[in-house]
Amino acid sequence: MSVPLALSFPAADGYVLHGHVWAHAQPCASRPVVVVNPATAVLSRYYARFAAYLHAAGCEVLTYDYRGIGGSRPARLRGFRAGWIEWGSLDFEGALREVQRRFAGQPILVAAHSAGGLALGLAPSNHLVARAFTMGAQFAHWRDYAPGQRLGMWWKWHVLMPALTACLGYFPGRRLGWMEDAPAGVVEDWTARAPRFEAVARRGGERVTARMRAQWLTQCAQPRADLLALSISDDPFAGDAAIERLLAYFTGCRRWRLHVRPAQIGVPAIGHFAFFHDRFADTLWPIARDWLLHGACPPEFAATAWPGETPPALSRSPAPAMCAASAPPG
């Protein structure tokens, strides 16, 4: 696996974020750069092998931790104010500015997991994104959880998680083995009772106004990227309703959906998180690679437009104007 370089960069409000970059030694103006937006309370290092895979395919890649998570966690998480709004409008915005500065003029692409798809819609500079791939990206409401698991998930994520957060001032996910620790604001966003984010989103301790909500909706409609939303049939978090609820916000994008069943690739389960495990490098990762580099899916997977026309069949010839891969410096 290629060795990334550790880096730090400012979010839009100056908060220092930490991450890694996979860069090629020789610059090339047409080489795409991929920003990887993590899921809620998932460390950026979870995506390292996926990032190395995209790097080997000819991309520059940036991974990073949102504020309050992993390398971007403050010394004291109790009382630290951060939520999905900050992760999108400030942190992802900072990542876009960083790749624009570091790889000036190169095409910017996004690979987003779960809540990372919502972050795509909230950054003021999201119009810079030329193409996006999302995995299990949704604005989930508890009623959207898988029917057979809904009650257990409701107790876990909507009763126990907010109760522990209220007691401690943050969610101790790592201690429980559920996920990483998370700021209280993220828990508030996750456990909100309404199915639309603008109705329940919070911005730190600031009062959310109708003007802010209108601005968020405008920013979600701003990107003109080609967007592929991948869903997995055994994903208990991201059912069809949740996936399509988020997809509906991106009215300026050309949108496609791809739904995959584990049996299609000969495995018993995939779920919400396993896509980024390297055991799927030969079966699932080509979906992301081919979409980001070619704007189409491998022939064994059929995406459908949402709504509209079917995307073109993938040409197996190299993407036009792609640069030769090279080792990272150092």
Label the model's feature ranges.
Residues P223, A229-S231:
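Short beta-strand/loop motif that positions the catalytic acidic residue
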